[in-house]
Amino acid sequence: MVKIGNVDIHGPLVLAPMAGVTDAPFRALCRAQGAALTCTEMVSAKALVYHDEKTKQLLWSPPDEHPAAAQIFGHEPEVMAEAAPMALEYSGADILDINMGCPVGKVIRSGDGSALMRDPELAGRVIEAVVKAVDAPVTVKFRKGWDGGNVNAVAFAQMCQQAGASAIAVHGRTRVQMYAGRADWDIIRDVKRAVTIPVIANGDIFSGADAAHILRYTGADLAMIGRGSFGDPWLFARGNAAIAGEPEPELPPLCERIEAALHQIEFAADIKGERLACLEARSQFCWYLRGVPHANTYKQEVVHVETLDELRRITHAIQRDLRD
């Protein structure tokens, strides 16, 4: 067990916050497969302060989702401090996470996300302001650095700890790398040796063996699975088994995986409405089609889906093909 502030994490694997991915239905799937901590999609602190209804909706969580974190992004200490309690209230989360790692251009241009790694003094003031504003533990997610010539993860981690963060998550790539190349697990190991708060290792966990290896190699307290979970929430079960030195469970049959994908979208429709859920299904459902015969044909149908009935028809057609 790992403690993040006063919150107990009963397992080694956590789900990364990912925009457009980690909504409540997907988090529920990952939790059912052994994710010990889940996190909302990142939301704009400024949008929360402006009481944007769509932003509030992104934070919606079922009452039984614990332990859980809510993630906000922004660079203005006063705005972040005002938004932090709101994020916890709307989500019911136990932990408040600050995004200082997002590499996306529109986020960077506003001075948010990993742009804060270029201004550690401001980043520290943001963390201090948020820590003072909430009773919950505050965590920070960041990267190796801005680029190859500006690798400052160790010093940044120490700053986070000094500013009051209860834990940190480190992605082993720079902002300039985005998601290209290999994640540098050495920098995560260096960070772990430099701080006393829990360290969460993130980057290139695509198998159960990867999950076990990153924890052994870096000495990190927890491992955070991101893109590896796309269409594969069962990765958490395999990772937990590998870490425990047990045989990894087999993937469920393709028919069951496709059914899980459909249930995910149906759950999303209950929360967001059918139209938005179907728009998101155009990418999310396709992740589950790996290994399906004629997958490209089905993908061409899915990317035009507008109703749940259409998606159900495609799902049943896939299942018929798999049984034949």
Language-model features: where?
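Alpha/beta catalytic cores of nucleotide-metabolism and tRNA/nucleoside-modifying enzymes
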Residues: 1, 9, 13, 19, ...
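Active-site beta-loop-alpha junctions enriched in small/polar residues
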Residues: 18-20, 43-45, 73-75, 101-103, ...
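Glycine-rich, positively charged N-terminal anion/phosphate-binding segment
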Residues: 1-3, 18-94
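Alpha/beta enzyme core
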Residues: 81-112, 120-197, 213
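Hydrophobic faces of well-ordered beta-strands that scaffold small-molecule active sites
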Residues: 13-17, 38-40, 68-72, 96, ...
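Hydrophobic alpha-helical membrane-association signature
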Residues: 119-122, 126, 260-261, 281
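N-terminal small/glycine-rich loop or linker at the start of catalytic domains
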Residues: 2-14, 46-67, 102-112, 127, ...
